[in-house]
């Protein structure tokens, strides 16, 4: 299949339309000019014929009065003949040698007798093609003859040809200018499309940083804007894929590390038991360590499975109206020992009437995970569990006086196994950030929001907002 460049396609389409338009316009204009010239010639002859015929209204006419008409008409190369009622000419112009009876046909003479004017725009009955007008002469309503005016149309044809020639020159000039302008415009548009093609090639090769400058509001400009948006989205997708891949690798490394530590401990203890190198009085402690490390691995696996179920929305929430102070008391009782081990104080601040609309077990899980995170990074400090009523919502705050979180790490704290501080790598269960990942997913499933306010060295505050039911509102 023959390939034609887009530039030439544009030019060909423009030129084809122009040529077609010019052909139609020239044809119509030429026809109009010709018709107008003939019509004008016939009207002029008719006007003179009527004036000459009016000279006979009195019944008698001095032939000398016709000579001025002859002089005027001769300058226009027009001749006239006057016939009597028997179709015999009794006034002939000088040098007119045609047989008189051949000047008018019988049908034309009959029309004249009826008082009708005979007009013929182009007739070839004479040596030259002429326009012909015959006007009847009536005296007191009695037919007395006719006036015949004859004018060659060569002048009309010459004028029409001259107009057509000028039209041809104008069309050629316009066509040349149009082709030049069309070439420049086509080059301009093709250049813009070429930039789009080059940008597309770069995107195809993996360069998503490309940006097309665009200051036009036409379709190509809109396409360039859409291309920039597409490239931006592709770049974001690539960055997100790379980030997720990095997180996946880090996740695998973290899980492997966290599983390796208890497995190494368990393996060492089992080998010690098998080889009887562990004293009898230490075996109970050995079994206790094996049990703790096994539970630690089970918790890790359970947390991951739980997170995936929540993320894929495979769990169903059973929301109830629960007194907030009741939940706070359960969380405090559950984590009191862990807090005391780090010399922390757990304190509750909530009025008895404050209600939260949530899934009981999952809401406790949310508070336990956040509170455990606060205990983990607070030493000899205070941890507050606060609750209050907001506008159509319940507000829960968990605030500590711990080490805080760097500003640049706050948005990443919800990621699995993310460690915002190097101190998180060697702490007990809870350092993985897995609990906070679950928190965010669960809060969103409750149609709520959770945010973090933190300042390094001063502490961290988690703010949870859960909507109330219609009845409570």
Curated annotation (Swiss-Prot):
What residues does the HAMP domain cover?
Answer: 187-239
Query: Which residues are modified to Phosphohistidine?
Result: 257
Where the record annotates domain Histidine kinase, the positions are 254-470
Q: What is its main location?
A: membrane
Q: Name one GO molecular function term.
A: phosphorelay sensor kinase activity
A Gene Ontology cellular-component term: plasma membrane
Looking up SMART domains in the UniProt record yields: HAMP, HATPase_c, HisKA
Q: Which reaction does it catalyse?
A: ATP + protein L-histidine = ADP + protein N-phospho-L-histidine
Keywords from the UniProt entry = ATP-binding, Cell membrane, Kinase, Membrane, Nucleotide-binding, Phosphoprotein, Transferase, Transmembrane, Transmembrane helix, Two-component regulatory system
Topology check: give the Cytoplasmic ranges: 1-9, 186-473
Q: What EC number(s) would the UniProt record show?
A: 2.7.13.3
Which top class of enzyme applies to this chain? transferase
Q: What top-level branch of life does the organism fall under?
A: Bacteria
Extracellular topology ranges: 31-164
Cellular localisation: Cell membrane
Q: Sorted alphabetically, which Pfam families does this protein's record hold?
A: HAMP, HATPase_c, HisKA
Which PROSITE patterns is this protein grouped with?
A: HAMP, HIS_KIN
GO BP term, pick one: osmosensory signaling via phosphorelay pathway
**Signal sequence interval, chain numbering:** none
Role played: Could be member of the two-component regulatory system YclK/YclJ. Potentially phosphorylates YclJ.
Its recorded name reads Sensor histidine kinase YclK
Organism per entry: Bacillus subtilis (strain 168)
Gene that encodes it: yclK
